[in-house]
């Protein structure tokens, strides 16, 4: 049984931005029976493991929440969302299949065969308390050295760590298909991340339950500049390859993600 509580994290003591407030309002609208609990420095010990202590000291608050979400769900159970996730319809059918996570990106080779796939627990995940997968993730983070990885430019995202852990346990993704590993349900990309890099827009389907707006709060100014350059380079490369097909979508990507600014 999944406790009727939605967890999110907001470290750093800054005000919640308008996007986060909008997303939290959507949780209240579509999951009205759930309590919403915002975790921060006042109710979560950021010094409990070296990784979160170091990340907090470096003001990399999103990395603090990477560990925190697993600890919080392991202790309490419930649903977790990143604060840039907007729910657009009732989640009852999804929660009934918990524990669950969602695919963020899929890459395909010839004949639409998946060659890489990533699962992002920030899109939304739910579990009863004491789930062993969350314990495995907590144990992993306890071994990490944030400051060393940051210095060596070796920091990994929670998406990388989670996907690698699932694959070590035998998870094999399939395009557009709900899959399972152990007792965890993994929903395809269109369920929680309907953004299309091809069209530059959200492609909402009957299977879409939420939208991830990608606030990217963990990125430094330098990393955001690198992302900007990647988008600009991608724009001209794809425009050269297929101008009529890609121009409209790529202009929309650049405008929506504001990579020119």
Question: Could you say what each language-model-derived stretch is?
Answer:
Residues 1-65, 83-261:
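Glycosyltransferase-associated regions of secretory-pathway enzymes
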Residues 66-78:
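Small-residue hinge/turn detector
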